[in-house]
Amino acid sequence: MKKKDIFISLGIIGAAVLAVWVCLQTKGYVQIDAGRADAELRLKDGWFTKAMITSGGGAAEVGARVFNARRLGISAKLNSQTWRIECLGPWGELSRIKVKSNETTTLRVGPPFLIKPRISRSGAVLAIDYAIVGRAGELYQSFATKDGGAMSGAKINIVDEAGNVLHAGQFSYG
């Protein structure tokens, strides 16, 4: 009687393992539409699965499940220089990416960007910042890199009605 119970238990465990294995083997596809820019998106599901999708390679095969975006980089070339901007969240529509079995999920990210100004004042100090928002509602960092290096802040001149420079300065990041 005990051997029979052991075989039944092993059969149930084997069927459960097989069912989980089959569920994990279903595949779907993800492709990125980043306009004329190049994109690299890192995804992670709730467990251990990670995937990296690039815009130039067509649709990439991934497991059919729900993913979360972890990092997104957009780069483009202009006059032989490579400009790059990164997104680490918040993610907008990319916060939950559902990939269905044998279907292609297209993610529209990056440009054209929406630039939203953020202005705050504390006493005599006026802080001007901006938010860079992509097509999926993803929020990018407020700075870009050029050829892999940091850029200097933009320069500004404050002039009066006659064109006289009242103050000259340079923006700084951070």
Where do the protein language model's features map onto the residues?
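N-terminal secretory signal peptides that target proteins for export/translocation
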Residues: 1-2
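Primarily secretory-pathway and cell-envelope proteins
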Residues: 5-9, 13, 19-45, 68-174
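Short beta-strand segments within Ig-like beta-sandwich modules, predominantly Fibronectin type-III
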Residues: 50-55
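A short, sequence-level motif marking secondary-structure junctions
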Residues: 56-59, 172-174
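A glycine-anchored, Pro-Gly-centered beta-turn/N-cap motif
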Residues: 58, 62-70
